[in-house]
């Protein structure tokens, strides 16, 4: 195998690592791999400029061997497809977090996002909030009742000191760590998603 083939193969393997990173972690979002993404971007630029230089020499009659043009183009397309698959899968998972946790991401999730992904999450949250507020006279919370309730009230345990919480009927509840409560399902669904409460079975 030539050194050029090894070089292209090495970068293609690195691009594939991005895809495999997501495949190996189907239930969690791994930290954004900025270093590997930059390496892939750099290699695409490098291959593009090499091809552009060959084309320019061919136009000037200085180059008569176009044999490396197609392999470089194939390598660029492969790297780009892997990067797009990586970004798209992360985007889909980030959107699902909005439905799972509401507008407040757990620190473990937020720390795995890059700045652009945090901005995307915030913009998606704002768009969803505007859409919900425009439904009906008082708006609709689409994050509630995502599954048919078996009972109107549920037993929950508080996982952290949260403080005072007001239910939809105006009842004040003090949520302290390890305390048990019977609350309306619709009032505590968001706190369950955020990890403040857990269902007691």
UniProtKB/Swiss-Prot annotation:
Superkingdom, taxonomy of origin: Eukaryota
GO biological process, one term: DNA strand elongation involved in mitotic DNA replication
InterPro entries: GINS_A (IPR021151), GINS_bundle-like_dom_sf (IPR036224), GINS_Psf1 (IPR005339), PSF1_C (IPR056783)
CDD domains: GINS_A_psf1, GINS_B_Psf1
A Pfam match: PSF1_C
Subcellular location: Nucleus
Keywords: DNA replication, Nucleus
Gene Ontology CC annotations of this record: GINS complex
Similarity comment text for this entry: Belongs to the GINS1/PSF1 family.
Family annotation (PANTHER family): DNA REPLICATION COMPLEX GINS PROTEIN PSF1 (PTHR12914:SF2), PARTNER OF SLD5 (PTHR12914)
Functional summary from the UniProt entry: The GINS complex plays an essential role in the initiation of DNA replication.
Oligomer and partners: Component of the GINS complex which is a heterotetramer of gins1, gins2, gins3 and gins4.
Protein name, per record: Probable DNA replication complex GINS protein PSF1
Species this protein is from: Caenorhabditis briggsae
Upper taxonomic lineage: Eukaryota, Metazoa, Ecdysozoa, Nematoda, Chromadorea
Gene name of the record: psf-1
């Amino acid at each position: 195998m030539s050194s050029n083939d090894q070089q292209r193969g090495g970068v293609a393997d690195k691009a594939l690592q991005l895809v495999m990173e997501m495949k190996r972690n189907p239930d969690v979002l791994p930290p954004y791999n900025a270093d590997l993404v930059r390496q892939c971007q750099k290699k695409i630029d490098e291959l593009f400029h090499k091809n552009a230089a060959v084309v320019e020499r061919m136009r000037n009659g200085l180059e008569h061997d176009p044999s490396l043009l197609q392999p470089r183009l194939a390598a660029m397309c492969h790297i780009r497809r892997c990067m797009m698959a990586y970004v798209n899968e992360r985007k889909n998972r980030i959107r699902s977090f909005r439905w799972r946790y509401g507008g407040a991401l757990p620190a473990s999730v937020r720390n795995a996002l890059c700045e652009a992904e945090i901005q995307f999450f915030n913009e998606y949250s704002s768009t969803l909030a505007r859409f919900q507020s425009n439904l009906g006279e008082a708006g609709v919370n689409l994050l509630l009742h995502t599954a048919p309730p078996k009972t109107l009230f549920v037993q929950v345990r508080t996982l952290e000191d949260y403080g005072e919480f007001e239910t939809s009927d105006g009842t004040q509840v003090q949520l302290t760590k390890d305390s048990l409560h019977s609350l309306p399902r619709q009032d505590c669904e968001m706190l369950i998603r955020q990890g403040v409460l857990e269902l007691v079975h």
